[in-house]
């Protein structure tokens, strides 16, 4: 609100009488999964406590085009001033929830139980909200940041001098119950990681044939697997069929199209 309103909404204040009371409704203009209603409501609570915001659906619900998702009443100035920020929350987060749900639906076509994960590829200061939207769409949150799980990537491995050295250093420093995951790009790296022992192996940019081989090796050692890299709606079902436990998708948060949602004054 500080960023958008600044010293005041000079357009609304010039045109709308201060004592004008109005009503409005927020409508979904396309089918999708809703997320962000609490933030939209909070926008108006902070802006003007006289505004009444009533959610007509819940976050995580699928709506059709034309569905009224919220009704607003109160000072007209406040309704108009908060419109853009409230819609920004709803459109962006509902877009993430909707895309996540599409990936979940595609991956569910196979018998294997697989979880769709988000990543750290989020907008600065939006991570909590964007990961919440992923959950609303049926996805599962990966680590929240660099502090709650160890994920050894290719650059860590390069600096450490190899997978074995990187894993051993991580194991020596890791606190109890902190998950240790390592990235592997080829079968030889998978075998090396299995030999040393980790909680999960991230199978990065592997083709389907290699994924199947890697998953089979990991299952024998009871190590969880996560497929990542190049995942899209066309290939996610095939990736799920390999038997991986998780599929992480950066596009959920960095490439989701905003859901078309509008606020209409009554």
Question: What do the predicted segments below correspond to?
Answer:
Residues 1-185, 189-196, 200, 209-217, ...:
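Acidic/glycine-rich phosphate/pyrophosphate-binding loops and surrounding catalytic core
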Residues 233:
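Cys/His-rich Zn2+-binding cysteine-cluster or related metal-binding knuckle/ribbon modules and their
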Residues 262-266:
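Active-site loop ensemble at the mouth of alpha/beta enzyme cores that anchors a bound cofactor
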